[in-house]
Structure formats: structure tokens, C-alpha cells
Amino acid sequence: MSIPKLSRRQFLALSAATAGVAALGSRFVPLPQTITPAGAAEPSLSEGQWIPTCCHMCGGTSGILCNVVNGRVAKIKPNTDNPIGLANVSSDYWQHKSEGAAMCPKGNAGIFTLYDPDRVKKPLKRTNPEKGKGVDPKWKEISWDEALDEIAAKLKALRDNGEAHTLLWFTEDSSFTDIQADFCDLYGTPNYSMHSNLCDVSRKAIFKSVMGHDRPLGDTVNSKYILFFGWNPLSATKWSHLPRTITRGIENGARFIVVDPYCSFTASKAHEWIPIKPSTDGAMALAMANVIIESKLYDQKFVDDWAVGFDQFSAYVKDKTPEWAEKITGVPADTIRRIAREFATTKPAIVDAWSGPGQHSNAVQGGRAIAVLAALTGNVDKPGTIMIPNKGGGAHPPIRVKKTDKPRLDGLSKFPMGHSSGVYTEIISRILDGKGPYQPKMAVVMFQNLVLSIPGTNNVIEALKKLDYVVVDDIYLSETAEMADIVLPGSTYLERYEVIGQWVTWPVVSLRQPVVPPIFGQLPEYDVVIQLGKRLGLKDADGAPFFESLKYEDYISKMIQGGSAKITLEELKALPGAVWMDPKGTQYEKHLAEVKPPEGATVDPKTGSVKDKDGKLVGVKVGDKVHKGFATPTGKLEFFSESLASKKDINGNPIDGLPAYTPRDWYPDDKFPLFLINWKESHHTHSRTFNNPYLMEIQNWNRLAINDVTAGKLGIQDGDEIWVESPYGKAKAIARVTQGIHPEVVGWQHGFGHWGFGKVAKGKGTADGQFNVTKSDPISGMALHKEVCVKVYKA
């Protein structure tokens, strides 16, 4: 096995093919047929129009400007009127806006995705009934009306037979999917699922249980100590401003520590990288808490005023010493002790954790142990700490609908901190074992590649084969599309609308809008839904046709008017950069806002929680004042959660109200002695950007990182062809021998290993999902992308 490189000849051929795509139809003007020689002056871009929109090469929604000349996109650059790409705190944004914003490699490469010659251009119908990995579907091109009529007929037959609930719907977690959720409600299926379940629902559960908000954000610019567990924001950039804000924090004097089994790009830029065994982050955090409490370095006044359960937590960590944690984590006790003292005595400080600790079976409890370190030191919602964002956005237009009383297939309600995005692994498992409340019959998959995204690739393929009918809407013939009966050509983010509530610390609403019309005349996903709704005659609870006269522009205009901005779609378009932001900016310590409790309110003498006569929390009494508090059940930060303690996980096990450490379910043994982890980088998103030659030039293969000492013991050298084997899968890979990974761990970048998708993506690297178990965290339902052990040997 050798790693192929994209030659300049191949690159030019792809670019020429892209030009041909852009030339399709009389409306379109071809891209240049040649590549500008290196060093030549860039063609003038003064002509045409600069249209503001938001990127969607990943979920970060960076603000961008697209130069459209004669009907084609000629250039993409950052939009400085949008804070994503520049800052997440308003003062930093307004002070440094003139410096310009940033954009990651994916954003720059978006033009190729728009004009990729491998895009699906017309609806396709399967003519080969056999399904399986690598099986030729023998596609037949059909018209849009034929495709929509057939899909609607299948949906109508299900509904008329009383089986509407057997429809599965998978999609992205963006506002353009709200109308898809409406469709599912009106049609009668509870099985609407979104991408979040495959990404960060455990982190959402972690912080929601401790702080009451599921996505706090770090004010790194103003911090003096930044401690990250299992997060790579300088490369796996969720938001493109993160490298800048973290770097500016370091320039302002912050000490930067990264705890991670792998020396990621972020770890390589930190003052200190602390290699740790996967899934043991919670044990290190508990030992840090032990040191902070025993040394009386915690913020006693903040804890007394704004936390519950401290006494129970303090008693629990009494024996969780650094020496105890060293045996579990592999991190030296002296290092844990030193980091704990540095963190507690350097103010302000940030502690944060993402998918590293979050994609294991002990994710929520381990993550809670990390989150309570912020509460312990008073580093919450203050400048330079972990912030509770005052996020803005659109409001889902109200709809009157009588929802089905059928249960979800995935058992979401049995996950005590499950997320509305569903539980993908449970759907797959229940299709295969038949232990769900019913067997699903049909699936609609929009903008998702389930086969390479859900742990346990072979299980996903077998589950899709068991469905009677599968519809995929995508821009590529992905591995999931390969399993479909109908494939609809999808839209890119440059061809559709969406309202974006930006993930910054103050309310900001921006617009994703078409900068060119759909280049193949295809319907954007929301118009597909509208057309299906019309064909099915879907009505609301009052009997009024919901989709009959609906225009999506009107739908999102109502979203904008009902949300933070309170303006119309046209008014948002007219604002600089098509961005609205609250002029009040970032607000700190929002929990301190004083409130007037209603008449008849009562105060819990134990917690200070103030509730109205109906038992609803309305504030928190601290001293002689009633404050807004946090959005937890008690209104305070929770070291101990009575809510969790009263519940059981999906397996029927009682949940500890404390962030108790328990080992994850799968651990190395003699047969499979190495942890296997994965990660992401800035030049790719999940499994969906691998047909872009600009990005594949940066990295076109995911070699398996293995510690040099471990490799030496196994007789493996850098570049060797190797076998990777787990209890669930076996495949060849190429070794990357390095000092930058824990000796008991191997790992690689997620998303490679396509056998479909497109000419550039096909056959590059190894698909990591095939090695994993199709399971989820029992509390949050998070897919377990890192819960597997392997053996590695020379091929």
C-alpha cells in the first residue's frame, strides 16, 4: 500500500472538469480553462458583486463574502461584519474588527465543492435490487417530478397503512432543517434525528448538568490560564476565530495546557502537553479537585453563594489523590498536583473539554468532573473564564400539530440526558436486533453519510439493507447514497438560504443566502420538503394545508422576525454583511441580575431556590437579594445533581449525583492491547470534504499514529504497511511513527477510507468507523467514536 499524491496534471484536469460544470446551462459562464501560473498577478476581481453569506464547509458558519462575476463564484473571502472568524467576545470584536477576519482552508476551498464535476446532477433511481458495499446500483436518471412522485407515493402508502411512524429521517442540525422537523411532525413520525448526536451531545449534557447551559464558550482572549481536555481548536476549528482568540490570549500572558493522548496541533502550540490514557480525564479532574480543596485554594465565597452539593463532592474526592489518579491516567502525580495549583491560583482561568473525553461510555460523568473545576474556582461567566453565552438566533415559526403518540425507535426518552438529535447507534442496533418497539420501513437521509459517520460501518450497511426504501439527498454519491433507492441532487451552502444564530457570547444573527442559483436547477432541501408536503396534502391541527402555498423565504422571514433581531428577511439582507448584532454586546455574570419574585413565591432554605406557586424556578436568594441564577434545577452550579441521582441510565443502572469516576466499558487486554482514538483537522469535515482536491492536497491519507517506543517493540517502522484489527473489523493501514502519542494509544484522522463519493476521495486512507462498536454513552446517547481497542502488526 502506498500513498498516492495528486499530480499537477490530475489537478489541472479536475479544474478543467470543474470549469465544465460551471458552464452547464445558458445561465452559467465557465470557469477559466487554465490555471494561473505561479507568481502571476491575480485577475482583477473589481467587477461583479460581493455577496455576504455564511460558510457551511463545516458547522462553524463563518461569515464570508463571495465575489460573483457573470453568474459564477470567482473568489471567497472572510466577512468582517460577522464575528465568526474574528472573535467571540464583543469588546474584542469591535476593538479589532479593522484587522480583518480569518477563514480556514475549507472555506477557501468551497468554490471547488460548488463546481465539483462529481456532484449529483439529476435524480437517480436504483435498478439493481441487490444492496451492499461496492454493489453497483445501476442508476437510471429520472426527472424531478418522477422522483418526487415516487417518494410521495411510498410515504403515502406508509401513512395510509397506519405506519407513518416507521419513517426514519436523518439530517443536519441547522436552521434549514427546521422545516424538515415540521414535515415529520405533520406526517406522523417521531423519528427525526440530527447530526449533533454524532458530534457533541455528551459535552452538552456535561455542561448543562453543571451550569444549566449546554454550550458554554471560553473567553480565551481575556484569560490568564487555559486548560483544555481532549480538544484541538487550533486545527479542528469548530469556529474559525478560535486560533486567533487563543493565540491572542497567549500573547496577553495566558499559560496554555492541553491534556490529550495525542499531541495535536493545538497541543504542539501549548506551553505543556500532558499525554493521558483515553477516557481517564475525569480521574485527573477529580484529583485536581482533591488538591484544590485540601489546599484550600477554592473560591469559598463563590461556592457558598452559587453552588450546591459541595460538601458531598468534597467528601467524595477526599481519597481521590494525585497518586490515585496516576495509576488510572498515567499522568504523574506531581504533574497533576502542579496543574491543579496553577489552575486554582491563576485568575481568570478557563477549563474546557470536548470530544476527547466526550466519546467514551463514561463521557458525562468524566466531563462533569472537569466542568466542576470551573465552579470550584469561581471561573464561570466572568471575563477570561468559561462563559454562558447569550446566544441570539431565529425562532421556529409556530405550527399547530397533533404529534403522534408512537414512541421513537431509538428509545431517546430512556437516556436521562439525551438530546433532541436522537441516538443514531440505537437506531442501527434496533433495526438489526429487532428489539425496538417496531421495525422501521423507510428512511430519508439529507446531507449525511451515515455509513462512514456512525460507529460500526458494517452494522450501518446491514441496517440500511433491511429497510424497504431509502431516499438520500446529497451532492455526492456517498457510501450511504450507494444504499439508496432514490438519490436527489443536493444543494451546497452557496445555493440555499438559512438563518444563523452565531455561537458567540452576545446575540448575533446572520444570513446564509444563495450567491448563485442551484447550478443544476435542483431543488434545495427545504423545497424538496415543501414539494413532498404538497403531494401528501399535509395539514396542521386546524385542518389547513401547511405546505400548499408556503414559500421558504416567507418561512425564514418569520423566523427572523420572531427571533432576536425582530426584523424581516429583506431588512437582514440590507444590513452590512447581512448580519444583525445586539449593540449591548457581551454581558458577564448574568446570574447576578436581580429579579422580583411573584407573589406567593417560596424559598428553599437548603439551596436558596425561589419558586412560584406552581413550582417553577424563578430565581435564587443569596443574602437578602433574589437573583436570576443559572438554568439548573436549583438555579446554582451543581457539584451534586439531584435530578441525575433520581434517574437510571439506558441500561437501568442508577446514576450517581456526583461526577463519580468509573472506567469505560472497553479496555485494552492481551488480545487487543492498544487504545484506538480518532480526531479531526481543519482541512476536512467529518467524511464530507474528501472529494475536494484543494483539501486533499493538504492531506490525502490518514496514516495510523503509533508511539515510537511501541512501534519499536512491534518491529514497525514509519511508512510500513500494517494491519489494524479490533473485535469488530480488520483493515490495512500505513504507520506514522511519532513521539507525539501516548505509548498505549494509536490513532488517526476521521473521515478517510471512501469507496464511493467521488474520484478524488475514493480509495484514500482507512475508514476508522469499521473498527468501532455500535454503542452510545448510556447517559447522553453520544455515539462512541473512541470506545475500542486494537492490535497492530506488520502486514
What are these regions (language model features)?
Residues 288, 307-424:
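Active-site phosphate/pyrophosphate-binding segments
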Residues 2, 180-246, 252-259, 266, ...:
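Extended redox/cofactor-interaction regions of prokaryotic respiratory oxidoreductases
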Residues 2-295, 319, 332, 531, ...:
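N-terminal export/assembly segments and adjacent metallocofactor-ligating motifs
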Residues 135, 229-231, 269-270, 319-324, ...:
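Flexible glycine/proline-enriched surface loops and loop-helix/loop-strand junctions
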